[in-house]
């Protein structure tokens, strides 16, 4: 149960990081 919660949090953090990186990359690319 705790392991599943840890995996969910880890995957959420990874997805959030990818979204942030993609957004900043797009902003730098447009300017």
Swiss-Prot record:
Protein origin, superkingdom: Viruses
Recorded family membership: Belongs to the coronaviruses NS3b protein family.
Name used for this protein in its record: Putative truncated non-structural protein 3b
Organism (species): Canine coronavirus (strain Insavc-1) (CCoV)
């Amino acid at each position: 149960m705790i392991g599943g919660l840890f995996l969910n949090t880890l995957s959420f953090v990874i997805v959030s990081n990818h979204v942030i990186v993609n957004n900043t990359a797009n902003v730098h690319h447009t300017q």
